[in-house]
Amino acid sequence: MAKKVEILVVGDLMLDHYIWGSCDRISPEAPVQVVKIAKETHRLGGAGNVVQNLLALGAKVSVASVVGDDEVGLRIKNMLSELGAGGGLILSEKGRESSIKSRVMASHQQVVRIDKESAVKINLESELVQKVTENLKNFSVVLLSDYGKGVLSDKVCRDIINECVRLDIPVLIDPKGNDYSKYKNATLLTPNRKEASEATGIAIKNTIDLRAAIMKLKNELNLKYSIVTLSEEGIALFDKELEIFPAEAKEVFDVTGAGDTVLATLGFMLASKKDIKEAIKMANLAAAVVVAKIGSATANFGEIEELLRSRANAEFEHKIKSAEQVAEILSQRGEKKVVFTNGCFDILHAGHARYLAKARDFGDILIVGLNSDASVRRLKGESRPINSQLDRACVLSGLGFVDYVVIFDEDTPMELIKKLRPDILVKGADYEGKEVVGSDIVKDVRLVEFVDGKSTSAIVKRIKDADK
């Protein structure tokens, strides 16, 4: 089993308190909604959400921070310990009030947020820096999650960054405020468009402005990479040139914590020795998973893989239609010639691809009738098909020269041909001298030569022989 990457998160820890309920009336005391509480939940917020995102990705995580010597601070420390992300690097400061953000949620919407915190500079700067620098050699990457609550002061940032540079450890920062000078010499920052505009004094209205702002950040702060997150547009990177990586999100329910997800994913990927472009692409995917959830959330690789699978299916499934749907489409075809062929196409190979490409050359629209799993079993035996009908349909749909795929359950495509009324039928040359199903309806029948030695049966036999 591969060793887990070890990452240190330094920053402002918070407790997110969610009050869930229903709202169906207005208060008689004031023009405000009345929320009937159903349940309350607590999550780690701020830098704690970065931690949870890293854990979801499979990293080993330690946390360095300062919390108040109070009930909320103790709860934060206990929650981190339960997650296995304590590390003994969290200090408690007397007289400091730990951050807690209470959100009232009704009908999946946030009604109000109530903050309780002391957003002032910590008194334990030197102690925190000492804790961090004594342990830096244990980590592949350091992430600074700055929420402007006082933990990441100028001294703390500069001292940690300088030591990371000395030890050649990448340090990634989610910044806060207008003055980014304390982040000088970091590997990269992840400001959003608004934050980058405020930090550079450049109103980012177009790509030219974006390039100017992102270059200014890179040059003035001596960053290895300069990044700006662009919400629904994706992530912009300036390495040697400006490049924008499009966002992957299709459904957005809540953007809370999406920046934490981006920081965590970039850190994890760089700790795993991936290049920056691959890291950004993965961060976009992780963010797409998170914004489709309610509240601060995380994304794991299983969810990211499922997102990619669903995207792949969605891209191809628009070609997979019922006979009725295709018949309706063909009713509007005008002068276009429709070509029809059919088969099991169990293990798609080069012979299939050439056959279908040739079939498409005969007309303007190619429809493939695909035998269902039950139909294949009746024709080929109980050991077939190797691939399910949906998998076979998706693979066929991925071919540019296939326009539509229609699955049929009968032993022959006769009923399908009657419904679609194509202009041309195509079959393999082995049908020479034989009656082609549907030829009494469609008079134009074309036969295509197969590629010698290319067949699903031959492939299956080779696989079985190799296992002997």
Curated annotation (Swiss-Prot):
Mind listing the UniProt keywords for this protein, alphabetically?
Answer: ATP-binding, Carbohydrate metabolism, Kinase, Multifunctional enzyme, Nucleotide-binding, Nucleotidyltransferase, Transferase
EC number assigned by the record:
2.7.1.167, 2.7.7.70
Q: Where is the active site?
A: 260
Q: Name one GO biological process term.
A: ADP-L-glycero-beta-D-manno-heptose biosynthetic process
Q: Which residues form the signal peptide?
A: none
Q: Where is this region: Ribokinase?
A: 1-315
Look at the named UniProt entry and state the broad enzyme category this protein falls under: transferase
Q: Which reaction does it catalyse?
A: D-glycero-beta-D-manno-heptose 7-phosphate + ATP = D-glycero-beta-D-manno-heptose 1,7-bisphosphate + ADP + H(+); D-glycero-beta-D-manno-heptose 1-phosphate + ATP + H(+) = ADP-D-glycero-beta-D-manno-heptose + diphosphate
MF-aspect GO terms: ATP binding; heptose 7-phosphate kinase activity; heptose-1-phosphate adenylyltransferase activity; phosphotransferase activity, alcohol group as acceptor
One Pfam family it belongs to: CTP_transf_like
Binding-site residues, ATP? 192-195
The domain of life for this entry's organism is Bacteria
CDD domains given in the database record: RfaE_like
Q: Where is this region: Cytidylyltransferase?
A: 340-468
Q: Which GO terms describe its cellular component?
A: cytosol
Per the record, the pathway is: Nucleotide-sugar biosynthesis; ADP-L-glycero-beta-D-manno-heptose biosynthesis; ADP-L-glycero-beta-D-manno-heptose from D-glycero-beta-D-manno-heptose 7-phosphate: step 1/4; Nucleotide-sugar biosynthesis; ADP-L-glycero-beta-D-manno-heptose biosynthesis; ADP-L-glycero-beta-D-manno-heptose from D-glycero-beta-D-manno-heptose 7-phosphate: step 3/4
Provide the assembly information.
Answer: Homodimer.
Q: So what family is this one in?
A: In the N-terminal section; belongs to the carbohydrate kinase PfkB family. In the C-terminal section; belongs to the cytidylyltransferase family.
Free-text function comment from the UniProt entry: Catalyzes the ADP transfer from ATP to D-glycero-beta-D-manno-heptose 1-phosphate, yielding ADP-D-glycero-beta-D-manno-heptose.
In Swiss-Prot or TrEMBL terms, this protein is called Bifunctional protein HldE
Q: Which organism is it from?
A: Campylobacter curvus (strain 525.92)
